[in-house]
């Protein structure tokens, strides 16, 4: 197996969902342990063998080279398979396909099939997949009005974010930034998001406990020492009116806008998720937050936009001023305003992904 393909299969080996790599002839050249446990060792077989295996029933057409998606039913649990073309030049052309349980996140993917059917470029396919795993702007659980924007610097970005319900009183939100760009970084965003979902119950004990678990999962990948992920977690307890925060090297600190328009920054230190973070402890900070207050999370691509004449960056101060000025506007408007203002602040772009979350506490 070639070095580039070997690095990708090494990452797929750690996934907790099924994945394989196939060549242009639809021959399976690699199958990860999870998929092998379900289907057996299919290396060397054609991809069509999955459709004749046991109780797996195809409910939509087989994936094609254009990056279409297909749904499978496994014991009445819906799974969706995604395919991304991978052109490694002289090493050959391949497809990476993975099968993910979509019973909890199905609403996120409702437009995936139609979007992917028209796309031929491998980077555009990966970009659509990456964007589609992000939460939609909506009101969640009658508790949080959630609005976000994501603008990657390149076709494949490294920012990602999500929110999820832990129980009837507690809700988890986070934003993260993977170092670098390209196929490896985009695959790592999918992996880290999946690990958050798998380990989310650890946040009930503490957001710092969740970070410690993610560090272990990351280190198990044995990636290059230059690879790292910054993350900030915020757990909202509706019953106690508390927001508990842990930071793993994310240099854009959470910003709280109170219902009277006053702003508060929550500065916290912490090591980025990386090899050198193994065994380190993370801190927690808990603040009071009430209905009518607003939580803003963002990545450094926004604050690093630089004025080409003065050399000054847009900075967290630029975010704070806009958040205070437009605190009475809805989150969707504010997210767009901050994005637009940071972009036109300079003629020269910082060339980094830009993401922002506006979470209004409703109850």
Predicted regions and their residues:
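Terminal output helix/cap of sensory domains in signal transduction proteins
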Residues: 46-75, 339-342
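… and, occasionally, acidic/histidine-rich disordered N-termini of signaling adaptors
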Residues: 77, 111-296, 347-363
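Active-site-proximal, acidic helix/loop segment immediately C-terminal to a metal-coordinating Asp/Glu
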Residues: 39-40, 183-203, 293-349
């Amino acid at each position: 197996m070639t070095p580039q393909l070997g690095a990708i299969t090494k990452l797929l080996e750690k996934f907790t969902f099924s994945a394989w790599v196939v060549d242009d002839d639809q021959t399976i050249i690699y199958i990860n342990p999870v998929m092998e446990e379900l289907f057996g060792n299919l290396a060397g077989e054609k991809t069509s063998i999955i459709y004749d295996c046991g109780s797996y029933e195809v409910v939509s057409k087989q994936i094609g080279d254009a990056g279409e998606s297909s749904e499978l039913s496994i014991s009445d649990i819906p799974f969706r398979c995604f395919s991304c073309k991978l052109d490694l030049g002289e090493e050959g052309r391949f497809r990476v396909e993975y099968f993910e349980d979509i019973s909890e996140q199905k609403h996120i993917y409702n437009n995936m099939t139609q979007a992917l059917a028209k796309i031929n470029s491998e980077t555009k396919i990966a970009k659509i997949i990456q964007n589609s795993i992000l939460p939609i702007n909506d009101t969640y659980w009658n508790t949080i009005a959630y609005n976000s924007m994501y603008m990657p610097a390149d076709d494949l970005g490294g920012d990602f974010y999500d929110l999820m319900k832990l129980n009837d009183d507690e809700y988890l939100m986070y934003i993260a930034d993977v170092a670098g760009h390209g196929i490896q970084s985009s695959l790592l965003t999918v992996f880290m998001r999946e690990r958050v979902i798998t380990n989310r119950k650890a946040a009930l004990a503490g957001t710092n406990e969740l970070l410690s678990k993610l560090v272990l999962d990351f280190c198990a990948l044995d990636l290059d020492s230059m690879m790292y992920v910054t993350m900030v977690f915020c757990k909202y307890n509706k019953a106690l009116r508390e927001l508990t925060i842990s930071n793993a090297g994310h240099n854009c600190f959470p910003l709280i806008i109170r219902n009277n328009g006053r702003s508060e920054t929550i500065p916290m230190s912490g090591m980025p998720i990386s090899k050198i973070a193994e065994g380190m402890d993370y801190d927690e900070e808990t603040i009071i937050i009430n209905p009518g207050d607003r939580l803003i999370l963002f990545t450094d691509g926004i604050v690093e936009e630089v004025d080409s004449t003065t050399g000054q960056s847009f900075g967290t101060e630029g975010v704070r001023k806009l958040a205070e000025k437009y605190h009475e506007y809805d989150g969707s408007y504010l997210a767009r305003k901050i994005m637009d203002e940071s972009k036109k602040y300079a003629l020269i772009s910082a060339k980094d992904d830009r993401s922002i979350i506006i979470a209004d506490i409703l109850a």
